[in-house]
């Protein structure tokens, strides 16, 4: 087959996710993507899912370097300069940190990123240093961040954009796993962030399946959120609390205490994406 253009879409799951049915918005978006010769798709399970690192991978991201090596191998096996190739990177939590680190590596080898879509980057991985600055080789980026996360160990790593046209960092109501789609009892906020990131990726060439359907946009100010700090099943709260500040985030014209809601939209299409009305 003589291809004039190809997409490479790479997905980095969050800590402990991507195996045994444990998924977030990262895998949900990956599963909506077309996979063929014109678009190759790759998923990296999150830290704490690799043999020998089940505990320390979850605690401190000990297997992050293993994940990056695996991602580089896949990229080197699949990237082509002819035909032209667009690269799309996605990640949640530490997976977002890895997606950003991978984008920095691509910049060093003179490969641009067509789109970077990430959910609530947390800066809590050993020996993985990532800059707040978005690599200039990233053509467009979107970063969905959690307004209400209070756990100290889930320190946000903002995405500093070189110019407004380079992307958007938006604060959503909810805690870390509300944003990334980890809670099973309520997906409303996660659905909103999934649609926000996916639609922008499609506008920039990501191909979704013909029957792919994204959730409609909602007024998030009326939706319930979780309290990750008080959940008994979560021991991270024992490490202390710290309220996030958003001085470097663009808040869509609103303060952090009065988030601009995503407006509802009618059923329609975005590229080849349907939204549920």
Model-flagged regions — what are they?
Residues 1-277:
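Active-site- or binding-pocket-proximal scaffold segments within functional domains
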């Amino acid at each position: 087959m003589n291809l004039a253009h190809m997409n490479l879409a790479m997905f980095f799951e969050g800590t402990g996710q991507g195996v045994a049915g444990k998924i977030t918005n990262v895998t949900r978006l990956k599963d909506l993507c077309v996979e063929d010769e014109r678009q190759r798709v790759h998923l990296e399970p999150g830290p704490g899912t690799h043999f020998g690192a089940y505990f320390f991978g979850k605690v401190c991201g000990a297997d992050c370097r293993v994940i990056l090596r695996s991602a580089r191998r896949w990229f080197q096996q699949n990237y082509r300069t002819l035909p032209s190739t667009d690269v799309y990177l996605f990640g949640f939590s530490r997976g977002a940190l890895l997606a950003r680190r991978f984008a920095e590596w691509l910049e060093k080898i003179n490969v641009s990123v067509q789109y970077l879509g990430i959910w609530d980057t947390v800066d809590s991985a050993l020996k993985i240093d990532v800059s707040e600055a978005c690599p200039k080789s990233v053509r467009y980026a979107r970063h969905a961040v959690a307004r209400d996360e209070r756990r100290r160990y889930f320190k946000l790593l903002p995405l500093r954009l070189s110019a407004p046209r380079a992307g958007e960092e938006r604060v959503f109501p909810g805690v870390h796993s509300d944003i990334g789609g980890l809670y099973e009892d309520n997906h409303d906020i996660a659905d909103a962030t999934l649609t926000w990131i996916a639609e922008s990726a499609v506008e920039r060439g990501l191909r979704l399946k013909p029957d792919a359907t994204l959730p409609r946009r909602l007024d998030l100010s009326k939706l319930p959120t979780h309290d990750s700090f008080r959940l008994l099943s979560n021991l991270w709260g024992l490490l202390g609390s710290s309220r996030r500040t958003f001085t470097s985030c663009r808040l869509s014209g609103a303060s952090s205490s009065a988030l601009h809601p995503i407006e509802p939209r009618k059923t329609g299409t975005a590229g080849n994406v349907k939204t549920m009305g």
